[in-house]
Amino acid sequence: MMRLWGRKNSINVQKILWCLLELGLHEGKDFERIDAGLQFGKNHTPEFLKLNPNGLVPTLEDGDMALWESNTIMRYLARTHDRNHHFPTDIKSQYHSEKWMDWHLSDMWPQLRAAFLGLTRVPEAERNYDIIRKNYQDSNLKFAVLDQVLCGQKYCSGSQFHLGDIVLALCVHRWILLNKTFPEKTGPRTQLIHIDNWMQRITEETLFNEIADKELNIVVR
């Protein structure tokens, strides 16, 4: 049985959990999940560091192989466990999805992550709200790029749901939650109709609601 290390409220662990659900794989039946990271600890023990020397979650064990990096784990699961061809396998769809997964890491996530950490991990007395606001507003610009593409297609890689949609939808959800939770600190969230429509499809046609946070995990206030 596969073993997934990571807490459910980690956005990177949520990617894996959502992917597993879409593949028809369920916790306790098809894989074991161990809470790790933040309040659960365990990710800096000698046992864990043998699996992932970075000491980060998620980490996946499958037989004698250990994988880290959430996007890599999703690619592996889709390649090895998608027996019913849930995700498209044609080259065009595959690499459009890959493109968005890479864009998320290099262009979009850094600003959103900085705003999130600034508001949920840094004590209030130490927060730089000017930088937090700038990072959030820069995220608005990044999401406008995605919105423009979704104007002409149903999902990020074309007509079918793919791994890239998992990555991006979780980030859009966090972008929305940040503004709902800290509206005065983030500044306004740009209204992007094509992203709104895409998220509506995601909630209606996929298993997003089973793993998505209802509120932010705020560690410090």
Name the predicted role of every residue range:
Residues 92, 96, 100-204:
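GST-like fold's C-terminal all-alpha helical module
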Residues 208-221:
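C-terminal helix/juxtamembrane-tail motif
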Residues 50, 204, 213:
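Phosphate-coordinating loops and pocket residues in cytosolic domains that bind phosphorylated ligands
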Residues 78, 171-172, 212:
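Active-site-flanking alpha-helical
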Residues 1-133:
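GST-like domain detector, emphasizing the conserved glutathione-binding G-site
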Residues 24, 55, 153-154, 206:
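Structural motif
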